[in-house]
Amino acid sequence: MAVIKKPDLTDPVLRAKLAKGMGHNYYGEPAWPNDLLYMFPVVIFGSFACVIGLAVLDPAAVGEPANPFATPLEILPEWYFYPTFQLLRTVPNKLLGVLLMAAVPAGLLTVPFIENINKFQNPFRRPIATTVFLIGTFAAIWLGIGACLPIDISLTLGLF
């Protein structure tokens, strides 16, 4: 059972502060209208001006034009698809590859239920979920690096 500290509303000092309007946010200036009407537009327009200025002064290079008659030797997906691309590339059976791809989100869905009794936010107090996260992160990085290499050294990364 979690212990939650609640304010004692029978305390006369606290009741006097609440009567004067001094609750949890009685200091400083109010967010409405000062922040929402005056500061947010300045920040939004400033950010927009920075983005437009960078786009005008230093446009991103699109690259060479596409040539439909010359295809590269190996077509790679975007970088965030490298781990799943590596899974599909190294698993010999197509059905097993699809099942492994479906196992990734299924495994992520089970992580909160592994330690549902322990409600701590600190990862050091949740060793199972932290271990699952670290192993998954290491495997994703390993597979992502391996996807950029030729197929014969992709699993070992050329280290062994």
Swiss-Prot record:
Topology in membrane: Multi-pass membrane protein
Keyword Chloroplast annotated: yes
Gene3D superfamilies given in the database record: plastocyanin oxidoreductase, Single helix bin
GO biological process: mitochondrial electron transport, ubiquinol to cytochrome c; photosynthetic electron transport chain
One GO CC term on file: chloroplast thylakoid membrane
InterPro entries membership: Cyt_b/b6_C, Cyt_b/b6_C_sf, Cyt_b6/f_cplx_suIV, Cytochrome_b_C_euk/bac
Subunit relationships: The 4 large subunits of the cytochrome b6-f complex are cytochrome b6, subunit IV (17 kDa polypeptide, petD), cytochrome f and the Rieske protein, while the 4 small subunits are petG, petL, petM and petN. The complex functions as a dimer.
Stated family: Belongs to the cytochrome b family. PetD subfamily.
Protein's recorded name: Cytochrome b6-f complex subunit 4
Species, as recorded: Tupiella akineta (Green alga)
